[in-house]
């Protein structure tokens, strides 16, 4: 069965890190090239003294002390050339002279016997590196399965401690102690911590302004660019119906669109969704849960129709969709319904603005891990990009009681950065206010009588 914990874990860690004034980019199910480009964008947020944190949940392995994150398009069997080396990301972070580098890796650390290459990664000697591994070397990571959406084992305990005003290694030590008391994973999974931290560095260190304020402002604009939501809008049809469209971000590459009827003519007797050849599985549903929106549902307005659009990082051109109505009036008698349509262009929302689908740049993390047969030395055929989220069926809830299962995880990652005070450099301020929500003011309870297909055809329109 599809496991659900990574999506829940990424969502909750995103909210916790934002409370700590981190700029957070949260992404799910990326291909290899998308992962490498996402790392490039993450690095743009870093500069001298900034605290950088990377959380990853998904398939992974460890060879010769190096950890590898496996993208969704990796072949079977996969090798290091198909994956992203965590230590190569660390090397690039060190080049930014960051104040703290934290890696939280919620993945298996078994040896990959299909991969015999030895990475040649030369790291600087810096006393600011912390690794929190969800499991021990050469061991597997687990998650609990149940009839509801719950956290993985690591984040189940991490989220209770992450906001503590303590040195990050102290926080992880306490998480390890908590995990050690958990009967379900005793003897199967234990948190491992590796650290070179020589000073008291905490994720709660205050964010202050300093000489690097201008640079921080530039980086904040870069982050804001990837989290800009479309403006809510009102659509008026010739028939007298008025519709409100609103937008929310579930993740940096997942957009939620919700709509409701604001006004309709009193003599309208029938109005329903236009039946077109579009898969309605995640479109125009009366509850967020029907579309797979389990985590954001409590934050959305009620009495709407909801659509969930994922895989935004694959969007190459502006996103155009058609809002379609069909209905009848009292005066029409037995005549067939009339159709009305309007085209809506929301350009490139959220992470789509950063074009993660682009070819990998030559100065990306490919260059930090010189391995035989790596893409930068022996280019192979490009992976075909499949729809993001790979449509894992999160609606299939397990009926069994809690049990342990090997982490066959859909990929999820959180990258965050913040500039706390505490390192003698010139710290600068980074605001981490979450992306703007466009919430319509009006609402209607009359959803059964008047329905709208606000995305019945997705089109790509040249910029």
Regions from the language model: what does each represent?
Residues 1-463:
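Cysteine endopeptidase catalytic domains of the caspase/legumain-like
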């Amino acid at each position: 069965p599809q496991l659900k914990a990574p999506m829940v874990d990424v969502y909750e860690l995103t909210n916790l890190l934002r409370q700590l004034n981190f700029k957070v980019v949260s992404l799910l199910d990326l291909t290899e090239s998308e992962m490498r480009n996402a790392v490039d964008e993450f690095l743009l947020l870093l500069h001298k003294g900034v605290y950088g944190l990377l959380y990853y949940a998904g398939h992974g392995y460890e060879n010769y002390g190096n950890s590898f994150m496996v993208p969704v398009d990796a072949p079977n069997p996969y090798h290091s050339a198909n994956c992203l080396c965590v230590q190569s990301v660390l090397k690039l972070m060190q080049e930014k002279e960051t104040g703290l580098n934290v890696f939280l890796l919620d993945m298996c650390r078994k040896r990959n016997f299909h991969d015999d290459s030895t990475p040649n990664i030369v790291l600087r000697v810096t006393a600011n590196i912390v690794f929190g591994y969800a499991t021990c070397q050469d061991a597997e990571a687990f998650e609990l399965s149940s009839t509801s959406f719950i956290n993985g084992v690591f984040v189940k305990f991490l989220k209770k401690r992450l906001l503590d005003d303590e040195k990050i290694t102290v926080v992880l030590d306490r998480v390890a102690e908590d995990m050690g008391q958990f009967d379900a994973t005793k003897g199967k999974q234990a948190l491992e911590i590796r650290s070179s931290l020589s000073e008291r560095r905490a994720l709660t260190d205050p964010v202050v302004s300093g000489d690097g304020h201008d640079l921080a402002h530039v980086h904040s604009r870069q982050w804001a660019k990837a989290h800009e939501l479309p403006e809510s809008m009102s659509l008026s049809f010739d028939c007298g119906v008025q519709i409100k469209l609103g937008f929310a971000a579930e993740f940096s590459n997942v957009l939620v669109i919700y709509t409701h009827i604001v006004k309709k003519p009193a003599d309208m007797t029938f109005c329903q969704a236009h039946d077109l050849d579009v898969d309605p599985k995640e479109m125009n549903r009366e509850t967020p849960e029907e579309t797979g929106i389990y985590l954001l549902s409590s934050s959305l307005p009620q009495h709407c129709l909801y659509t969930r659009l994922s895989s935004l990082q694959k969007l190459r051109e502006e996103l155009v969709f058609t809002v379609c109505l069909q209905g009848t009036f009292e005066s029409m008698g037995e005549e067939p319904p009339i159709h009305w349509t309007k085209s809506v262009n929301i350009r490139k929302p959220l992470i789509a603005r950063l074009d993660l689908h682009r070819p990998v740049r030559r100065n990306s993390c490919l260059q930090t891990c010189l391995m035989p047969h790596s893409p930068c030395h022996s280019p192979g055929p490009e992976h075909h990009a499949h729809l993001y989220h790979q449509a894992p069926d999160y609606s299939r809830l397990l009926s069994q009681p809690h049990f342990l299962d090997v982490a066959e995880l859909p990929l999820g990652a959180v990258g965050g950065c913040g500039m706390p005070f505490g390192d003698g450099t010139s710290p600068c301020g980074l605001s981490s206010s979450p992306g703007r929500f466009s919430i319509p003011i009006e609402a209607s309870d009359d959803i059964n009588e008047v329905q709208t297909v606000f995305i019945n055809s997705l089109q790509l329109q040249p910029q």
